[in-house]
């Protein structure tokens, strides 16, 4: 590598404008970073952070789930909790939609995903570390809470099933043949069990920083190589269409990218970290900041995948794209470290997903979790259900794809419930509720339209699906306005 190449790699925006390449990508990176400092700060001030208010980590400390931890550790745990396969595999699939994927990753992260993650964590913190179903029940009603408990636990089981096979396959490709995929599936499941039942600071608090380092190395390494390679990525002024067969941009792209822009799964993870925060002011770097970093990871993988598709075509699975990019771009050692980062992301989402499911069931059943036997009692049926889905995905040729699609839709639907619950909270607290109302309306339209049009849904034609999505969104807006006007009447 020449001195000029190194300088260009360290000055990405200089090279973008110098060579008139990757300008859209570079601008998108800058906007994401600015979004944290500008809009993230506004959201924090709007919420009304109280640095003197005691947090659940202090008032409910139990040494297991409610426990004070250093802010940097909480950030790393939150980042790894939410950064599963979504910002990597989802971004790779989303790259087939062209520069539209950049727009959704950037603006979806800043105005929807990061707001969703931050406020779900802070509302939980203000409610003594309440889980997502409890928050939804308080602000949307007890009937909705019951639906949310079932829906959330289902999503957690899907997360575990989805986030086992792919990392097991990647590890098997790096180890002796006698250590096959099934061996690593058992190892990962065993790790899930240990991480789910032990106190959060014993395994998760110690292992996650190492995993986080690998994931950060992967993202930074690929970013540097992108600016060295200078691929001719599509620019926004060339149009937002795509030459690949990926389906209609709306709603398919908004479901495919999933965690790279907004994810309901994150709202199940934010309360876990809300139970460990020492001060409310740490909420912005932990919740909003982790989502912005995930958006950056998704943007990097979307750009890398675009460069890959231009050179090799799209007839590859997301796992194959990851394996090729890591090994070809970063060399043997760098590729191994990068793949370890990719492996760490889904595994660390899977264990905290199971932990979330355990805590949600414990809250519902009012079962204390200080004894290991009671933790095991709740974990057993969850692991059995996940194992059943995993077996289905292995035995069925399209099993993983089917489970992934249902996971993606359930994931985004969960974000809709979360955004509506937070909107109600903001109205009751007399704060700017439009910051969540607008994303709530948009995502309501997305998930409704998707389930109408998708192969795993009702398989309706596009026009009818758009009409139904629009009608459902207007109905949601009407019900919200009616409820809000009812508050004024009571007052």
Model-derived features: positions:
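Membrane-interface loop-to-helix entry segments
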Residues: 26, 30-50, 141, 151, ...
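Hydrophobic alpha-helical segments and their helix-loop junctions in multi-pass secondary transporters
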Residues: 160-184, 195-196, 215-241, 425-433, ...
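Flexible loop linkers connecting adjacent transmembrane helices
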Residues: 41-67, 90-93, 107, 115-144, ...
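Membrane-interface "cap" regions at the ends of multi-pass membrane proteins
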Residues: 19, 31-88, 252, 282
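Extracellular/periplasmic helix-exit of transmembrane alpha-helices
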Residues: 226-236, 288-324, 394-395
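Helix-loop-helix module between adjacent transmembrane segments
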Residues: 32, 36, 112-128, 132-197, ...
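Hydrophobic, membrane-embedded alpha-helices of multi-pass small-molecule transporters
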Residues: 69-86, 223-231, 239-301, 340-349
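Extracellular loop-to-transmembrane helix junctions
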Residues: 22-40, 94-124, 133, 334-335, ...
């Amino acid at each position: 590598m020449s001195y000029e190449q190194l300088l260009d790699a360290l000055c990405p925006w200089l090279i973008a404008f110098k060579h008139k390449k990757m300008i859209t990508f570079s601008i998108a990176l800058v906007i994401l970073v600015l979004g944290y400092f500008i809009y993230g700060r506004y959201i924090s001030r709007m919420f009304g952070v109280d640095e003197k208010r005691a947090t659940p980590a202090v008032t409910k400390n139990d040494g297991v789930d409610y426990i004070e931890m250093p802010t940097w550790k909480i950030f790393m745990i939150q980042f790894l909790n939410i950064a599963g396969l979504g910002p990597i595999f989802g971004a790779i699939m989303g790259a087939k939609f062209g520069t539209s994927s950049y727009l959704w990753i950037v603006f979806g992260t800043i105005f929807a995903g990061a707001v969703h993650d931050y406020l779900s964590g802070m509302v939980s913190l203000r409610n003594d570390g309440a889980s997502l179903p409890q928050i939804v029940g308080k602000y949307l009603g007890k009937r909705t809470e019951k639906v949310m408990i079932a829906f959330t636990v289902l999503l957690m089981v899907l997360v575990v099933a989805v986030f086992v096979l792919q990392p097991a396959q990647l590890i098997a490709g790096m180890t002796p043949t006698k250590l096959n995929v099934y061996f690593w599936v058992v190892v990962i499941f065993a790790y899930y069990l240990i991480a789910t039942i032990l106190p959060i600071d014993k395994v998760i608090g110690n292992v996650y920083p190492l995993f986080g380092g690998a994931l950060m190395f992967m993202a930074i390494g690929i970013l540097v190589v992108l600016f060295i390679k200078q691929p001719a990525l599509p620019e926004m002024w060339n149009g937002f269409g795509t030459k690949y067969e990926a389906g209609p941009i709306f709603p398919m792209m908004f479901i495919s990218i999933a965690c790279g822009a907004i994810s309901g799964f994150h709202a199940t993870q934010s309360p876990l970290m809300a139970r460990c925060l020492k001060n409310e002011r740490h909420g912005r770097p932990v919740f909003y900041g982790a989502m912005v970093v995930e958006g950056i990871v998704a943007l990097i993988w979307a750009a890398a995948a675009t460069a890959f598709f231009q050179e090799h075509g799209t007839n590859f699975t997301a796992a194959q794209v990851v394996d090729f990019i890591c090994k070809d771009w970063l060399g043997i050692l760098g590729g191994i470290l990068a793949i370890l980062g990719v492996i760490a992301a889904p595994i660390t989402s899977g264990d905290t997903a199971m932990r979330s499911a355990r805590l949600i069931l414990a809250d519902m059943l009012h079962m204390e979790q200080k004894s290991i036997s009671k933790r095991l009692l709740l974990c057993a049926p969850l692991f059995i259900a996940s194992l059943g889905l995993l077996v289905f995905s292995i035995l069925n040729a399209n099993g993983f794809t089917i489970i992934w699609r249902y996971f993606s839709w359930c994931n985004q639907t969960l974000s809709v419930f979360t955004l509506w619950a937070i909107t109600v909270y903001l109205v009751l607290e007399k704060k700017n509720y439009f910051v969540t109302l607008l994303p709530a309306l948009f995502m309501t339209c997305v998930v409704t339209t998707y389930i109408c049009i998708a192969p795993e849904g009702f398989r309706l034609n596009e026009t009818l699906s758009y009409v139904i999505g629009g009608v459902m969104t207007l109905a949601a807006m009407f019900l919200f306005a009616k409820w809000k006007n009812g508050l004024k009447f009571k007052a």
